Regions:
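C-terminal catalytic histidine-bearing segment of alpha/beta-hydrolase fold enzymes
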Residues: 164-193
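Acidic catalytic loop of the alpha/beta-hydrolase fold
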Residues: 114, 158-162
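Short beta-strand/loop motif that positions the catalytic acidic residue
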Residues: 147, 152-155, 159
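Short alpha-helix in the alpha/beta-hydrolase fold that links the catalytic acid
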Residues: 17, 140, 149, 163-173
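Catalytic nucleophile-loop/oxyanion-hole region of alpha/beta-hydrolase
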Residues: 13-15, 20, 33-70
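Primarily recognizes the serine-hydrolase "nucleophile elbow" in alpha/beta-hydrolase
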Residues: 54-122, 135-136, 140
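Short beta-strand element of the alpha/beta-hydrolase
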Residues: 1-7
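Active-site nucleophile elbow and catalytic-triad environment of alpha/beta-hydrolase enzymes
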Residues: 128-143, 148-149
Length: 193
């Protein structure tokens, strides 16, 4: 199953990064679904992360009934949805024992860091504050471990919304942890293309 996690800066779930992407995977023969998660003021207290973990758990619970391989669940996260997908693989949800994790990640121009190259608006929506210190809770490049699932990621060098440094920081962390990954960096292309 490929579970598509659209972006939208945690302000909305982008329609063009949801069903159209899922339909492309379906046309290639994959089971697909699109995660619609809490955004705006509803996104506080890591609710989107909880919803993603619950979705993965639900798919595994019904895997036989839905004819899905429970150990082959990939998340396709786009932009802020890439942050959410990567969070689902590496971020510990407080008070959630046996947190369901994906088996692979497909990330398109993901938000990764709350540091120098952050997409500040995503972190402000997620935390409800402009306080950069509060954003650090959701930075991900320092949470990569050898247990992180394999990653495919792509980004464009001229993305001005989510700087390519987000992907470069991720790649460095994946390399240091020995996590299998493949990356495609394109010279041209604005955010969302």
């Amino acid at each position: 199953l490929v579970l598509v996690v659209p972006g939208g800066g945690y302000t909305h779930v982008s329609p063009r990064e949801g069903d159209p992407v899922a339909l492309q995977f379906a046309a290639a023969g994959y089971h697909t679904a699109v995660l619609h998660y809490a955004v705006g003021d509803s996104a506080r207290d890591a609710l989107p992360m909880r919803q993603l973990a619950q979705a993965i758990g639900l798919v595994r619970q019904h895997a036989e009934q839905w004819n899905i391989l429970p150990d082959q669940i990939a998340l396709c996260g786009i932009s802020a949805g890439g942050h959410l997908a990567l969070s689902g693989a590496v971020w510990e949800i407080p008070d959630m024992a046996d947190q369901p994790r994906p088996n692979a990640l497909l990330l398109a121009y993901p938000v990764v860091t709350a540091g120098e190259y952050a997409h500040r608006d995503s972190f402000a929506q997620l935390t409800g504050t402009q306080d950069v210190a509060a954003h650090q809770r959701f930075t991900l490049e320092d949470k990569i471990t050898p247990a992180t699932p394999p990653v495919f990621v792509w980004h464009t060098m001229e993305d001005e919304t989510v700087p390519v440094e987000n992907t470069l920081l991720l790649l460095n962390a994946l390399h240091k942890a020995g996590v299998p990954c493949e990356a495609h960096l394109f010279e041209k292309g604005r955010h969302g293309t």
